């Protein structure tokens, strides 16, 4: 393969929306010479945001893999979206890299997106580095941001390059490793005299030296002895500290004006771990036993599918991170999940819209393969002689659900296949064909997410849809017992129809309809019992209030009569239905609504607001407990009908830090004051008409 694993750096570029991630990626591509011109987010011309929706919205919507080759090193940069609705990109990318570069805006400072990116990196054991962008802007405040990072990210923060200005206001950048300063003209580095930044300079050098000293006992002795470190000791100590999670180096510059990018690239090479530095990757063999994979081409192939692109015109493209071995054209690889064999087409290096064929993808490298049949995101492709499975990815679960309406008649059938294609490339999108409410429902991470799905369905698949709140699947039940007769008699010439039953209807704890018989003396022959039961069950599919299915109902056949000639199965089905319809209005009918268990994970400062809102939504707070990410988990029970806009509320209230899950708990009686609205809606939907027809 072209690049040995020790000359590869796999890096996720993450942070808040607008912090400069895509511009930095674009600048690094241009700086390396891989692009003739530098694109702009504002113009929709960047390499990583090549999707039409990204260009239109001027924001990244999915993770984009951008390979950069510079001075013999290959940097596989993964530009992740900063918008919370599209954070699946971060979760995809984190599985393919050893390092995370957190981008922080020199103007906006440390925002929630940067915090979440840093936490995701730490949770997944990745090396971290910070780049403070836009440092040449007038209102940038690097040192305030530095102090804020120490508070939010912890004591590992270690500045390595700091900004300053010459007397004429020209931005310069001080390299604390070499203790030299540089200005930039057209992206080219020019050394200048070290500007005076007061007492800060010695303090920064002292702090960096102490951080390096803590990585090695010999360096600690040298530090306390007052001896300066050599350049080699600084780099090696810093590299070790980064790998062990003891140091988070902070660099800065301006991507737009090509300032200090050379120092960033150089230190991404020197300080961030290569795939070779990973001791091993843990997987499971075919028997579920643990097995270690090593980053070498001498081992059998194991490659992880971390991203999928499904385009109706270009076809399916699977992005692979090769853990061991190598991926080459014509090689058969086994999908560990399905057992199917995939034949590998020519491996590709993808740069924006450009696809370049190559000889293969070596251990530790990232590339793409087209036209895989069974593979999806999270799958492991491996040598048939050593079938291994890497841990399945964990993605945020959909929290906002909307029903789909079709603008053009006849497009209903196209929706499911089009959504299936979109779900291949978006693990946080889900599709439910709800047979009970007769609606097609899609779920995502927020309003923007579903709006993009709507746009892609139209632009990629020619299906125009609308979105509306999904209907609630209510139930009906009764509160008291009622005994009624159902008598079906019909004479039409020849054989007639006759069935006569007396049934007692009462509430019960079962979620289903329970049927029993207590007939004495053969008033209803046993061979008609199943028909009576069938009639009750058919009738109970529609309640008398709003036409919703009835639950918690026990029907006991007590008595009746029959005709030796005219009685039939159908006659007793009809008799049971008549008894049901006569009894239900007098049995205290009620409408039941679904109650969900809500688990809201929010910062401690927001717990009061969230609990107050839950109460306003007719919810009951059951308790609160800390979670593993330092948030508080509020546990509550809330009617599903009240959770429609909770996704937006929790995100706005917590500034994007909070998230939640819900799970069906049970059905409860709908408050009397809300019944008329539900009944009125049922009339509009035709529920009651259908019930009457039965």
PLM features: what roles do these ranges have?
Residues 1-694:
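Structural and coupling elements of P-loop NTPases
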């Amino acid at each position: 393969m072209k690049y040995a694993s020790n000359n590869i750096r796999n890096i996720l570029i993450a942070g808040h929306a607008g912090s400069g991630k895509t511009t930095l990626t674009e600048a690094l591509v241009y700086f390396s010479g891989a692009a003739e011109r530098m694109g702009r987010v504002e113009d929709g011309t960047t390499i990583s945001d090549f999707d039409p929706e990204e260009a239109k919205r001027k924001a990244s919507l999915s993770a984009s893999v951008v390979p950069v080759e510079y001075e013999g090193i290959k940097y596989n940069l993964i530009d992740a979206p900063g918008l919370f609705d599209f954070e699946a990109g971060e979760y995809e990318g984190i599985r393919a890299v050893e390092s995370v570069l957190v981008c922080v805006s020199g103007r906006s400072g440390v925002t929630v997106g940067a915090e979440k990116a840093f936490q995701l990196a730490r949770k997944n054991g990745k090396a971290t580095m910070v780049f403070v962008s836009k440092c040449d802007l007038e209102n940038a405040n690097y040192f305030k941001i530095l102090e804020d990072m120490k508070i939010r990210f912890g004591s590992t923060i270690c500045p390595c390059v700091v900004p300053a200005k010459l007397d004429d206001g020209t931005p310069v950048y001080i390299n604390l490793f070499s203790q030299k300063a540089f200005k930039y003209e057209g992206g080219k580095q020019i050394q200048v005299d070290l500007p005076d930044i007061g007492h800060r300079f010695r303090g920064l050098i002292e702090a960096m030296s102490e951080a390096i000293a803590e990585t090695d006992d010999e360096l600690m002795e040298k530090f306390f002895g007052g001896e300066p470190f050599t350049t080699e000791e600084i780099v090696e100590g810093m590299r070790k500290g980064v790998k062990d999670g003891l140091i988070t180096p902070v660099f800065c510059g301006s991507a737009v004006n090509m300032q200090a990018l050379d120092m960033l690239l150089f230190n991404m090479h020197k300080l961030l771990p290569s795939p070779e530095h990973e001791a091993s990757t843990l997987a499971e063999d075919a028997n579920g036993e643990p097995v270690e994979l090593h980053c070498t081409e001498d081992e059998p192939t194991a490659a992880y599918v971390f991203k999928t692109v499904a385009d109706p015109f270009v076809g399916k493209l699977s992005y692979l991170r090769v853990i061991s071995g190598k991926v080459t054209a014509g090689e058969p690889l086994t999908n560990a999940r399905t057992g199917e064999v995939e034949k590998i087409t020519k491996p590709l290096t993808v740069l924006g819209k450009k696809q370049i064929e190559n000889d293969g993808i070596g251990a530790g490298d990232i590339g793409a393969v087209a036209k895989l049949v069974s593979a999806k995101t999270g799958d492991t492709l491996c040598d048939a002689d050593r079938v291994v499975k890497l841990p399945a990815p964990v993605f945020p679960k959909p929290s906002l659900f909307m029903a789909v309406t079709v603008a053009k008649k006849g497009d209903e059938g196209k929706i499911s296949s089009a959504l299936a294609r979109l779900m291949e490339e978006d693990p946080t999108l889900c599709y439910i064909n709800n047979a009970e409410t007769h609606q097609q429902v899609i779920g995502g991470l927020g309003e923007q997410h579903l709006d993009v799905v709507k746009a892609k369905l139209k632009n990629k698949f020619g299906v125009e849809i609308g979105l509306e709140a999904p209907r609630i699947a209510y139930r009906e039940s009764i509160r008291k017992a009622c005994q009624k007769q159902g008598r079906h008699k019909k004479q039409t010439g020849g054989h007639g129809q006759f069935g006569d039953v007396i049934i007692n209807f009462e509430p019960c704890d079962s979620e289903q309809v329970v049927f029993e018989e207590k007939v004495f003396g053969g008033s209803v022959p046993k061979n008609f019992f199943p028909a009576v039961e069938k009639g009750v069950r058919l009738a109970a599919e529609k309640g008398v209030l709003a036409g919703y299915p009835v639950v918690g109902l026990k029907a006991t056949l007590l008595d009746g009569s029959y005709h030796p000639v005219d009685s039939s199965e159908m006659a007793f089905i009809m008799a049971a239905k008549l008894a049901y319809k006569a009894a239900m209005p007098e049995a205290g009918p009620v409408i039941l609504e679904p109650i969900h268990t809500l688990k809201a994970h929010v910062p401690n400062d927001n717990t009061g607001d969230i609990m107050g809102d839950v109460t306003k939504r007719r919810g009951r707070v059951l308790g609160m407990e800390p979670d593993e990410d330092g948030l508080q988990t509020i546990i509550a029970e809330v009617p599903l009908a009240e959770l429609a806009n909770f996704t937006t509320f929790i995100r706005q209230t917590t500034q994007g830090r909070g998230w939640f899950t819900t799970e069906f708990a049970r059905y409860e009686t709908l408050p009397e004051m809300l019944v008329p609205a539900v009944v009125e809606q049922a009339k509009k939907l035709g529920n009651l008409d259908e019930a009457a027809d039965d």
